Protein backbone atom coordinates (compact mmCIF):
# COMPACT_ATOMS: atom_id res chain seq x y z
CA UNK A 1 0.00 0.00 0.00
CA UNK A 2 1.70 3.20 -1.21
CA UNK A 3 0.62 6.22 0.81
CA UNK A 4 3.33 8.58 -0.44
CA UNK A 5 2.53 8.66 -4.17
CA UNK A 6 0.32 11.75 -3.93
CA UNK A 7 3.14 13.63 -2.18
CA UNK A 8 5.58 12.51 -4.88
CA UNK A 9 3.25 13.79 -7.61
CA UNK A 10 3.44 17.27 -6.09
CA UNK A 11 7.11 16.95 -5.20
CA UNK A 12 6.65 17.61 -1.48
CA UNK A 13 7.57 15.85 1.75
CA UNK A 14 4.94 13.85 3.65
CA UNK A 15 5.16 16.41 6.48
CA UNK A 16 4.62 19.39 4.17
CA UNK A 17 2.35 22.20 5.37
CA UNK A 18 -0.82 23.21 3.53
CA UNK A 19 0.93 26.31 2.19
CA UNK A 20 3.78 24.17 0.82
CA UNK A 21 1.30 21.74 -0.76
CA UNK A 22 -0.66 24.56 -2.39
CA UNK A 23 2.49 26.23 -3.73
CA UNK A 24 3.73 22.93 -5.16
CA UNK A 25 0.33 22.20 -6.70
CA UNK A 26 0.24 25.51 -8.56
CA UNK A 27 3.76 24.93 -9.87
CA UNK A 28 3.01 21.40 -11.11
CA UNK A 29 -0.44 22.36 -12.40
CA UNK A 30 1.05 25.09 -14.56
CA UNK A 31 3.84 22.77 -15.73
CA UNK A 32 1.43 20.13 -17.05
CA UNK A 33 -1.57 22.27 -17.97
CA UNK A 34 -2.78 20.89 -21.35
CA UNK A 35 -3.16 24.38 -22.79
CA UNK A 36 0.46 25.21 -21.97
CA UNK A 37 2.17 21.85 -22.38
CA UNK A 38 1.58 19.97 -25.63
CA UNK A 39 3.94 17.08 -24.83
CA UNK A 40 2.55 13.55 -24.88
CA UNK A 41 1.38 12.50 -21.42
CA UNK A 42 1.12 16.05 -20.07
CA UNK A 43 -2.67 15.91 -19.79
CA UNK A 44 -2.52 12.65 -17.82
CA UNK A 45 0.10 14.16 -15.50
CA UNK A 46 -2.15 17.18 -15.04
CA UNK A 47 -5.05 14.93 -13.98
CA UNK A 48 -2.79 13.09 -11.53
CA UNK A 49 -1.69 16.39 -9.99
CA UNK A 50 -5.34 17.45 -9.61
CA UNK A 51 -6.21 14.13 -7.96
CA UNK A 52 -3.33 14.40 -5.51
CA UNK A 53 -4.14 17.98 -4.54
CA UNK A 54 -7.83 17.25 -4.05
CA UNK A 55 -6.88 14.74 -1.35
CA UNK A 56 -3.91 16.45 0.29
CA UNK A 57 -5.62 19.86 0.52
CA UNK A 58 -8.39 18.35 2.66
CA UNK A 59 -7.12 17.52 6.16
CA UNK A 60 -9.63 14.70 6.70
CA UNK A 61 -8.92 13.08 3.33
CA UNK A 62 -5.19 13.56 3.87
CA UNK A 63 -5.31 11.80 7.25
CA UNK A 64 -7.22 8.89 5.71
CA UNK A 65 -4.72 8.71 2.85
CA UNK A 66 -1.73 8.77 5.21
CA UNK A 67 -3.19 5.82 7.12
CA UNK A 68 -4.80 3.72 4.41
CA UNK A 69 -3.51 5.01 1.09
CA UNK A 70 -5.71 5.80 -1.90
CA UNK A 71 -8.54 3.54 -0.67
CA UNK A 72 -8.83 5.59 2.51
CA UNK A 73 -8.87 8.90 0.64
CA UNK A 74 -11.67 7.63 -1.59
CA UNK A 75 -13.83 6.51 1.31
CA UNK A 76 -12.90 2.83 1.22
CA UNK A 77 -12.61 2.74 5.01
CA UNK A 78 -15.70 4.76 5.83
CA UNK A 79 -16.10 8.47 5.57
CA UNK A 80 -18.26 11.48 6.00
CA UNK A 81 -19.66 13.92 3.49
CA UNK A 82 -21.88 16.92 3.48
CA UNK A 83 -24.91 15.18 4.92
CA UNK A 84 -27.08 15.04 1.83
CA UNK A 85 -28.58 17.58 -0.53
CA UNK A 86 -29.02 20.19 2.17
CA UNK A 87 -25.29 20.79 2.24
CA UNK A 88 -25.34 20.68 6.03
CA UNK A 89 -23.94 18.31 8.62
CA UNK A 90 -22.52 18.10 12.09
CA UNK A 91 -19.02 16.98 12.96
CA UNK A 92 -19.21 13.67 14.77
CA UNK A 93 -16.54 12.33 17.04
CA UNK A 94 -15.12 8.85 17.19
CA UNK A 95 -12.19 7.20 15.52
CA UNK A 96 -11.50 4.28 13.27
CA UNK A 97 -8.60 2.03 12.49
CA UNK A 98 -7.00 -0.61 14.69
CA UNK A 99 -6.68 -0.32 18.43
CA UNK A 100 -3.87 -1.51 20.66
CA UNK A 101 -3.48 -2.27 24.32
CA UNK A 102 -5.95 0.47 25.16
CA UNK A 103 -8.73 -1.45 23.36
CA UNK A 104 -7.79 -4.67 25.12
CA UNK A 105 -7.90 -3.14 28.57
CA UNK A 106 -11.08 -1.25 27.70
CA UNK A 107 -12.79 -4.55 26.98
CA UNK A 108 -11.75 -5.83 30.40
CA UNK A 109 -12.33 -2.72 32.46
CA UNK A 110 -15.19 -0.98 30.65
CA UNK A 111 -13.25 2.04 29.53
CA UNK A 112 -10.24 4.05 30.54
CA UNK A 113 -8.74 7.47 30.65
CA UNK A 114 -9.17 10.30 33.09
CA UNK A 115 -12.49 10.89 34.78
CA UNK A 116 -14.52 13.81 33.48
CA UNK A 117 -16.68 15.96 35.67
CA UNK A 118 -20.20 15.43 34.27
CA UNK A 119 -21.24 18.87 35.48
CA UNK A 120 -18.37 20.73 33.81
CA UNK A 121 -19.30 23.12 30.98
CA UNK A 122 -18.77 21.61 27.53
CA UNK A 123 -18.71 23.35 24.18
CA UNK A 124 -21.45 22.47 21.69
CA UNK A 125 -20.89 20.51 18.50
CA UNK A 126 -19.39 22.15 15.42
CA UNK A 127 -21.51 22.22 12.27
CA UNK A 128 -20.66 22.33 8.58
CA UNK A 129 -22.53 24.03 5.74
CA UNK A 130 -21.74 24.05 2.03
CA UNK A 131 -22.27 27.25 0.04
CA UNK A 132 -22.47 27.08 -3.75
CA UNK A 133 -20.91 30.10 -5.45
CA UNK A 134 -21.03 31.30 -9.02
CA UNK A 135 -17.64 31.74 -10.69
CA UNK A 136 -17.85 35.54 -10.50
CA UNK A 137 -18.99 35.49 -6.84
CA UNK A 138 -15.88 33.56 -5.88
CA UNK A 139 -13.71 36.01 -7.81
CA UNK A 140 -15.10 39.24 -6.38
CA UNK A 141 -16.66 38.13 -3.08
CA UNK A 142 -20.30 38.28 -2.04
CA UNK A 143 -22.59 38.29 0.99
CA UNK A 144 -24.81 35.26 1.54
CA UNK A 145 -27.59 34.55 4.00
CA UNK A 146 -27.20 31.03 5.36
CA UNK A 147 -30.21 29.36 6.97
CA UNK A 148 -29.82 26.07 8.83
CA UNK A 149 -31.06 24.20 11.89
CA UNK A 150 -29.00 24.11 15.05
CA UNK A 151 -29.54 23.11 18.64
CA UNK A 152 -30.24 25.99 21.00
CA UNK A 153 -31.14 26.10 24.67
CA UNK A 154 -34.77 25.15 25.17
CA UNK A 155 -36.87 28.30 25.38
CA UNK A 156 -39.19 26.69 27.93
CA UNK A 157 -36.77 25.33 30.54
CA UNK A 158 -33.74 27.47 29.72
CA UNK A 159 -31.61 24.38 29.18
CA UNK A 160 -32.25 22.60 32.48
CA UNK A 161 -34.41 19.90 30.90
CA UNK A 162 -36.82 20.04 33.87
CA UNK A 163 -40.48 20.94 33.87
CA UNK A 164 -41.34 24.52 34.83
CA UNK A 165 -41.29 24.91 38.62
CA UNK A 166 -38.94 21.95 39.13
CA UNK A 167 -35.18 21.47 39.02
CA UNK A 168 -32.83 18.60 38.17
CA UNK A 169 -31.73 16.67 41.26
CA UNK A 170 -28.47 14.95 42.07
CA UNK A 171 -28.56 11.39 40.75
CA UNK A 172 -29.45 9.00 43.57
CA UNK A 173 -27.33 6.18 42.14
CA UNK A 174 -23.98 7.84 41.36
CA UNK A 175 -24.24 10.78 43.76
CA UNK A 176 -23.63 13.25 40.95
CA UNK A 177 -20.36 11.69 39.76
CA UNK A 178 -21.82 10.33 36.53
CA UNK A 179 -20.03 7.02 37.07
CA UNK A 180 -20.54 3.97 39.26
CA UNK A 181 -18.20 1.21 40.45
CA UNK A 182 -18.78 -2.33 39.21
CA UNK A 183 -16.95 -5.60 39.80
CA UNK A 184 -16.22 -7.80 36.79
CA UNK A 185 -14.67 -11.19 36.26
CA UNK A 186 -11.78 -10.92 33.79
CA UNK A 187 -9.03 -13.30 32.63
CA UNK A 188 -6.85 -11.48 35.18
CA UNK A 189 -9.27 -12.13 38.04
CA UNK A 190 -12.05 -10.10 39.62
CA UNK A 191 -11.53 -6.40 39.13
CA UNK A 192 -13.36 -3.24 40.05
CA UNK A 193 -13.80 -0.53 37.45
CA UNK A 194 -15.94 2.50 36.75
CA UNK A 195 -18.67 2.71 34.12
CA UNK A 196 -21.17 5.37 33.10
CA UNK A 197 -24.15 5.55 35.40
CA UNK A 198 -27.16 3.84 33.82
CA UNK A 199 -29.65 6.14 35.56
CA UNK A 200 -28.36 9.60 34.58
CA UNK A 201 -26.29 8.49 31.55
CA UNK A 202 -23.23 10.22 32.95
CA UNK A 203 -24.78 13.63 33.58
CA UNK A 204 -24.80 13.29 37.37
CA UNK A 205 -28.32 14.72 37.39
CA UNK A 206 -31.71 13.12 37.58
CA UNK A 207 -34.78 14.81 36.11
CA UNK A 208 -37.94 13.60 37.83
CA UNK A 209 -40.32 15.70 35.71
CA UNK A 210 -39.07 16.42 32.21
CA UNK A 211 -39.74 19.57 30.21
CA UNK A 212 -42.60 19.00 27.78
CA UNK A 213 -40.84 20.94 25.03
CA UNK A 214 -37.38 19.34 24.96
CA UNK A 215 -38.29 16.11 26.83
CA UNK A 216 -35.38 16.54 29.21
CA UNK A 217 -32.57 17.22 26.75
CA UNK A 218 -32.37 20.96 27.51
CA UNK A 219 -31.98 21.67 23.78
CA UNK A 220 -34.30 22.16 20.84
CA UNK A 221 -33.78 22.42 17.09
CA UNK A 222 -34.22 25.99 15.87
CA UNK A 223 -33.95 27.52 12.38
CA UNK A 224 -31.01 29.92 12.51
CA UNK A 225 -29.83 32.50 9.95
CA UNK A 226 -26.38 34.04 9.74
CA UNK A 227 -24.80 36.43 7.23
CA UNK A 228 -21.62 35.16 5.60
CA UNK A 229 -19.24 37.64 3.97
CA UNK A 230 -17.42 35.59 1.34
CA UNK A 231 -13.96 37.09 0.68
CA UNK A 232 -12.80 37.72 -2.88
CA UNK A 233 -10.66 34.95 -4.33
CA UNK A 234 -12.04 31.87 -2.54
CA UNK A 235 -11.76 28.45 -4.17
CA UNK A 236 -13.61 25.15 -3.99
CA UNK A 237 -12.90 23.27 -0.77
CA UNK A 238 -11.80 26.26 1.27
CA UNK A 239 -13.46 26.76 4.64
CA UNK A 240 -14.49 29.72 6.77
CA UNK A 241 -15.01 29.39 10.52
CA UNK A 242 -17.87 31.30 12.14
CA UNK A 243 -17.28 31.19 15.87
CA UNK A 244 -20.26 30.46 18.11
CA UNK A 245 -22.66 29.62 15.28
CA UNK A 246 -22.79 25.86 15.94
CA UNK A 247 -24.85 23.88 18.45
CA UNK A 248 -25.50 25.02 22.02
CA UNK A 249 -23.11 23.89 24.73
CA UNK A 250 -23.82 21.72 27.76
CA UNK A 251 -23.88 22.88 31.39
CA UNK A 252 -23.44 26.50 30.36
CA UNK A 253 -20.64 25.74 27.89
CA UNK A 254 -20.18 27.92 24.79
CA UNK A 255 -21.79 27.30 21.42
CA UNK A 256 -19.82 25.32 18.87
CA UNK A 257 -18.64 26.78 15.57
CA UNK A 258 -20.02 26.74 12.04
CA UNK A 259 -17.65 25.83 9.22
CA UNK A 260 -18.72 27.11 5.82
CA UNK A 261 -17.26 25.13 2.90
CA UNK A 262 -17.21 26.77 -0.53
CA UNK A 263 -18.13 25.03 -3.79
CA UNK A 264 -17.44 27.16 -6.88
CA UNK A 265 -19.28 26.56 -10.15
CA UNK A 266 -17.26 26.22 -13.34
CA UNK A 267 -17.26 29.05 -15.89
CA UNK A 268 -18.25 28.53 -19.52
CA UNK A 269 -15.51 30.98 -20.55
CA UNK A 270 -12.61 30.75 -18.15
CA UNK A 271 -10.55 28.15 -16.35
CA UNK A 272 -9.10 29.00 -12.98
CA UNK A 273 -6.06 27.73 -11.11
CA UNK A 274 -5.68 29.61 -7.86
CA UNK A 275 -5.28 33.28 -8.69
CA UNK A 276 -4.46 32.56 -12.33
CA UNK A 277 -7.12 32.45 -15.05
CA UNK A 278 -6.91 30.85 -18.49
CA UNK A 279 -8.90 31.83 -21.57
CA UNK A 280 -8.90 30.14 -24.98
CA UNK A 281 -9.07 32.86 -27.63
CA UNK A 282 -10.36 31.85 -31.09
CA UNK A 283 -8.55 33.75 -33.87
CA UNK A 284 -8.86 33.93 -37.64
CA UNK A 285 -5.81 32.50 -39.42
CA UNK A 286 -5.36 35.75 -41.36
CA UNK A 287 -5.09 37.71 -38.10
CA UNK A 288 -2.57 35.21 -36.80
CA UNK A 289 -0.51 35.37 -39.98
CA UNK A 290 -0.47 39.16 -40.33
CA UNK A 291 -0.68 40.12 -36.66
CA UNK A 292 -3.44 42.20 -35.13
CA UNK A 293 -4.72 43.97 -32.04
CA UNK A 294 -7.62 42.00 -30.58
CA UNK A 295 -10.10 42.47 -27.74
CA UNK A 296 -9.89 39.80 -25.05
CA UNK A 297 -12.49 39.12 -22.33
CA UNK A 298 -11.30 39.03 -18.72
CA UNK A 299 -13.18 38.84 -15.42
CA UNK A 300 -12.39 42.56 -15.06
CA UNK A 301 -13.74 43.52 -18.50
CA UNK A 302 -12.41 43.46 -22.06
CA UNK A 303 -8.81 44.51 -22.74
CA UNK A 304 -6.73 45.09 -25.89
CA UNK A 305 -3.96 42.61 -26.76
CA UNK A 306 -1.42 42.91 -29.59
CA UNK A 307 -0.80 39.64 -31.42
CA UNK A 308 2.45 39.46 -33.43
CA UNK A 309 2.54 38.22 -37.03
CA UNK A 310 3.05 34.48 -37.41
CA UNK A 311 1.34 33.52 -34.16
CA UNK A 312 0.62 29.78 -33.94
CA UNK A 313 -2.13 27.79 -32.23
CA UNK A 314 -1.21 27.15 -28.60
CA UNK A 315 0.76 30.37 -28.20
CA UNK A 316 -0.07 32.02 -24.89
CA UNK A 317 0.11 35.62 -23.73
CA UNK A 318 0.03 36.92 -20.17
CA UNK A 319 -2.25 39.73 -19.04
CA UNK A 320 -0.65 40.86 -15.81
CA UNK A 321 -3.03 41.53 -12.92
CA UNK A 322 -6.12 40.35 -14.81
CA UNK A 323 -6.58 37.14 -12.85
CA UNK A 324 -8.40 36.44 -9.58
CA UNK A 325 -7.64 38.30 -6.33
CA UNK A 326 -4.99 36.65 -4.16
CA UNK A 327 -6.80 35.43 -1.06
CA UNK A 328 -3.66 35.54 1.08
CA UNK A 329 -1.73 38.51 -0.16
CA UNK A 330 -2.33 41.63 -2.19
CA UNK A 331 -3.23 42.26 -5.79
CA UNK A 332 -4.49 39.90 -8.47
CA UNK A 333 -3.03 36.96 -10.31
CA UNK A 334 -2.58 36.95 -14.08
CA UNK A 335 -4.72 35.83 -17.00
CA UNK A 336 -3.21 33.64 -19.70
CA UNK A 337 -4.65 33.92 -23.20
CA UNK A 338 -4.19 30.73 -25.25
CA UNK A 339 -4.55 31.24 -28.99
CA UNK A 340 -6.72 28.82 -30.97
CA UNK A 341 -6.48 29.50 -34.72
CA UNK A 342 -9.71 28.75 -36.57
CA UNK A 343 -9.57 27.36 -40.11
CA UNK A 344 -12.36 28.87 -42.24
CA UNK A 345 -15.13 26.69 -43.67
CA UNK A 346 -17.53 27.23 -46.60
CA UNK A 347 -15.29 29.70 -48.46
CA UNK A 348 -16.92 31.89 -51.12
CA UNK A 349 -15.41 32.17 -54.58
CA UNK A 350 -13.50 35.38 -53.85
CA UNK A 351 -11.93 33.84 -50.74
CA UNK A 352 -10.94 30.70 -52.62
CA UNK A 353 -9.33 32.69 -55.39
CA UNK A 354 -7.43 34.83 -52.89
CA UNK A 355 -6.09 31.74 -51.12
CA UNK A 356 -5.20 30.06 -54.41
CA UNK A 357 -3.27 33.17 -55.42
CA UNK A 358 -1.47 33.15 -52.08
CA UNK A 359 -0.68 29.46 -52.47
CA UNK A 360 0.76 30.08 -55.93
CA UNK A 361 2.87 32.95 -54.61
CA UNK A 362 4.10 30.66 -51.84
CA UNK A 363 5.00 27.90 -54.27
CA UNK A 364 2.45 25.47 -52.88
CA UNK A 365 0.42 23.21 -55.14
CA UNK A 366 -3.22 22.87 -54.13
CA UNK A 367 -4.72 19.94 -56.00
CA UNK A 368 -7.81 19.03 -54.01
CA UNK A 369 -8.89 17.02 -51.01
CA UNK A 370 -6.67 14.21 -49.77
CA UNK A 371 -3.50 15.50 -51.43
CA UNK A 372 -0.73 17.83 -50.36
CA UNK A 373 -2.32 21.15 -49.63
CA UNK A 374 -1.57 24.73 -48.83
CA UNK A 375 -1.04 24.29 -45.09
CA UNK A 376 1.23 21.25 -45.46
CA UNK A 377 4.07 23.63 -46.23
CA UNK A 378 3.88 25.06 -42.73
CA UNK A 379 3.79 21.73 -40.84
From Swiss-Prot:
Transmembrane annotation, as ranges: none
Tagged with keyword Transferase: no
One GO CC annotation: cytoplasm
Residues the record lists as binding Zn(2+) 1: 154, 157, 211, 214
Keyword field: Chaperone, Cytoplasm, DNA replication, Metal-binding, Repeat, Stress response, Zinc, Zinc-finger
Cofactor binding description: Binds 2 Zn(2+) ions per monomer.
Domain J intervals: 5-69
Cofactor: Zn(2+)
Presence of keyword Nucleotide-binding: no
Range of residues in the leader sequence: none
InterPro entries, alphabetized: DnaJ, DnaJ_C, DnaJ_domain, DnaJ_domain_CS, HSP40/DnaJ_pept-bd, HSP_DnaJ_Cys-rich_dom, HSP_DnaJ_Cys-rich_dom_sf, J_dom_sf
Location, primary (coarse class): cytoplasm
GO biological process, one term: DNA replication
CXXCXGXG motif repeats: 154-161, 171-178, 197-204, 211-218
Zinc finger map (CR-type): 141-223
Residue sites binding Zn(2+) 2 per the record: 171, 174, 197, 200
GO molecular function, a single term: unfolded protein binding
Localization terms from the record: Cytoplasm
Family, similarity comment: Belongs to the DnaJ family.
NCBIfam families: DnaJ_bact, PRK10767.1, PRK14276.1
Function as written in the Swiss-Prot or TrEMBL entry: Participates actively in the response to hyperosmotic and heat shock by preventing the aggregation of stress-denatured proteins and by disaggregating proteins, also in an autonomous, DnaK-independent fashion. Unfolded proteins bind initially to DnaJ; upon interaction with the DnaJ-bound protein, DnaK hydrolyzes its bound ATP, resulting in the formation of a stable complex. GrpE releases ADP from DnaK; ATP binding to DnaK triggers the release of the substrate protein, thus completing the reaction cycle.
Quaternary context: Homodimer.
Domain notes: The J domain is necessary and sufficient to stimulate DnaK ATPase activity. Zinc center 1 plays an important role in the autonomous, DnaK-independent chaperone activity of DnaJ. Zinc center 2 is essential for interaction with DnaK and for DnaJ activity.
Name recorded for this polypeptide: Chaperone protein DnaJ
Protein encoded by which gene: dnaJ
Amino acid sequence: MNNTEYYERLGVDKNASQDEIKKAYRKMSKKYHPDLNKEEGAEEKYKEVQEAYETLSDEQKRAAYDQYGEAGANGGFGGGGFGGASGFSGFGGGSGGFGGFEDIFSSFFGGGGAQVNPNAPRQGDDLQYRINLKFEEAIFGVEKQVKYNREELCHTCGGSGAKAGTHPETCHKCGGRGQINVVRDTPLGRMQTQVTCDVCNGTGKEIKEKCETCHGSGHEKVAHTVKVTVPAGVETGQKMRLQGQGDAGVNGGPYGDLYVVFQVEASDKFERDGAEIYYKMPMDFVQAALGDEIEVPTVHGNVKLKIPAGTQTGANFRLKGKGAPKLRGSGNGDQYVIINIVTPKNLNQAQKEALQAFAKASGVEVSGSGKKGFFDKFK
